[in-house]
Curated annotation (Swiss-Prot):
Quaternary structure note: Heptamer of 7 subunits arranged in a ring. Interacts with the chaperonin GroEL.
Function: Together with the chaperonin GroEL, plays an essential role in assisting protein folding. The GroEL-GroES system forms a nano-cage that allows encapsulation of the non-native substrate proteins and provides a physical environment optimized to promote and accelerate protein folding. GroES binds to the apical surface of the GroEL ring, thereby capping the opening of the GroEL channel.
Keyword rRNA processing attached: no
Primary site of residence: cytoplasm
Subcellular location, record wording: Cytoplasm
Family matches, as NCBIfam families: PRK00364.1-1, PRK00364.1-2, PRK00364.2-2
Chain segments annotated as coiled-coil in the UniProt record: none
GO molecular function: ATP binding; metal ion binding; protein folding chaperone; protein-folding chaperone binding; unfolded protein binding
Organism: Shewanella sediminis (strain HAW-EB3)
Protein name, as recorded: Co-chaperonin GroES
GO cellular component terms, A-Z: cytoplasm
UniProt keyword list: Chaperone, Cytoplasm
Pfam (any one): Cpn10
GO biological process per UniProt: chaperone cofactor-dependent protein refolding
Length: 96
C-alpha cells in the first residue's frame, strides 16, 4: 500500500468480524456489527506541538488497535482495500 499519513494521522485496516452469533446463526445486514479493531498499516511523523517540536506517535505499524469511529474518521479505498484514516486521539487502546 503506497500511502503516508501526515502529522498525527494513522491508517488502519478494520479487522473482519465474526458473522455468526454465539448460537451459530449467520448474521447479515445491520445485525452484523462492524469491528472497532484494526491493524495499523501506516503512521504519520507525529503531532506538532505549540513550540514547533514533533511528538512521535505511540502506535507503530502492525499494532492491533481499538478505535472510536467518530467525527473526523475518513473511510477510503486504497489499492482496492477499504481503510480508515484517523487521528491518534481516536485510538483507545493497543491490543497486546
Amino acid at each position: 500500500m503506497n500511502i503516508r499519513p501526515l502529522h498525527d494521522r494513522v491508517i488502519v485496516k478494520r479487522s473482519e468480524v465474526e458473522s455468526k452469533s454465539a448460537g451459530g446463526i449467520v448474521l447479515t445486514g445491520s445485525a452484523a456489527e462492524q469491528s472497532s479493531r484494526g491493524e495499523v498499516l501506516a503512521v504519520g511523523n507525529g503531532r506538532i506541538l505549540e513550540n514547533g517540536s514533533v511528538q512521535p506517535l505511540d502506535v507503530k505499524v502492525g499494532d492491533i488497535v481499538i478505535f472510536n469511529e467518530g467525527y473526523g474518521v475518513k473511510k477510503e479505498k486504497i489499492d482496492g482495500e477499504e481503510v480508515l484514516i484517523l487521528s491518534e486521539s481516536d485510538l483507545m487502546a493497543v491490543v497486546s
